[in-house]
A protein has these predicted regions:
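Acidic/His-rich, metal-assisted hydrolase cores and their charged scaffolds
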Residues: 1-138
Length: 138
């Protein structure tokens, strides 16, 4: 599970996950699905798709020139509805879930943590800023 900010960070993670999958760096699980589970993150990803010149840097543009989409790849699943979100947790195959709320204080990531954090094979990968003290003092 990757708690991530919906705009920018999610798309950056998709870029790196596409590279990991393309280089076959996850031995034994090369075809693992990747879920983007956030309506806002899905919309932002669609904006990146539709406005490639404005959104991509030179490395991503070079991939596009080769016919490779830098953030969309086989096995990527974009989840918008709450039913789609809930269904992710019933599928027990190895997967990556990128869900909004980079600080885990709101949104669907809380649902995924509740249903998966207890599982020994689960990992939470923090890819953004985490303050030592929450805004409300926790």
């Amino acid at each position: 599970m990757i708690p991530s900010f919906a705009v920018g960070r999610t798309q950056e993670m998709l870029y790196f996950i596409r590279e990991i999958k393309a280089e076959h760096l996850v031995h034994g699980h090369g075809e693992f699905p990747v879920y983007v589970d956030s309506p806002l993150a899905v919309e932002a990803t669609n904006i990146f798709r539709d406005h490639q010149k404005e959104c991509y840097d030179s490395d991503a543009a070079a991939l596009l020139a080769q016919g490779i989409n830098p953030i969309l790849f086989p096995g990527l699943k974009l989840s918008i509805t709450s039913d789609e979100s809930k269904a992710i947790n019933f599928n027990e195959t190895p997967k990556v879930i990128i869900s909004a709320s980079g600080m885990c204080d709101a949104g669907r990531i809380k649902h995924h943590l509740k249903h998966n954090l207890w599982r020994q094979e689960s990992t939470v990968l923090f890819v953004g800023y985490q303050p030592s003290v929450h805004w409300d003092g926790r």
